[in-house]
UniProtKB/Swiss-Prot annotation:
The keyword Acyltransferase does not apply. Keywords: Ribonucleoprotein, Ribosomal protein, RNA-binding, rRNA-binding. NCBIfam families: L3_bact. GO terms for molecular function: rRNA binding; structural constituent of ribosome. InterPro entries: Ribosomal_uL3, Ribosomal_uL3_bac/org-type, Transl_B-barrel_sf. The lineage of its organism: Bacteria, Pseudomonadati, Campylobacterota, Epsilonproteobacteria, Campylobacterales. GO terms for biological process: translation. This is Large ribosomal subunit protein uL3. Belongs to the universal ribosomal protein uL3 family.
Amino acid sequence: MEFIVEKIGMSRTIGTKSEAVTLLRVLGAKVCEIYDNGKALVAYSQGKSVNKAIAGQQKKYSLSKEFNRFATLKVSNKEVGELDVASLSEAKRVQVSFKTKGRGFSGAMKRWNFQGGPGAHGSRFHRRLGSIGNREWPGRVQPGKKMAGHYGNELVSAKNDIMSFDKQSAILVLKGSVAGFNGAFGRIQIIK
């Protein structure tokens, strides 16, 4: 089963062995249409933006204005209506997928943890990349060379154990950390 979640932030457990935990809020969602392959079209709320295509979908599935995003998820529901979150109560482990924090155009030292050059005044090689090729042969830069460029904003998945799930407030507590900033939206999938 899959769910759309929002990252609240990190905290820790209080006890003899304190552990770092991540708090996620499971978004309230509505199942609009169920497909034959066990997946379903699910509507959920994210922001306030609505265009004509979304307005048409809201009218088609008779949804309120707040449900302005759609996703295809594996669900346990057998019929259209509220997304069933009861399966999270018995779940032990989930796969969490979030986008990492976007860091824009970054240099090689930040992006790939390169050492860089000496920091002394006489040096003119501080944070630069250095040599990027070989000799006359192959006479080109090899594909996959680690250079400066866009860093972050990549989809990352991790497997985390579930510490607890409060059905009332829809707060899921996971052991360890997950990628992304506080307030980011992602997906979780029950593994076992």
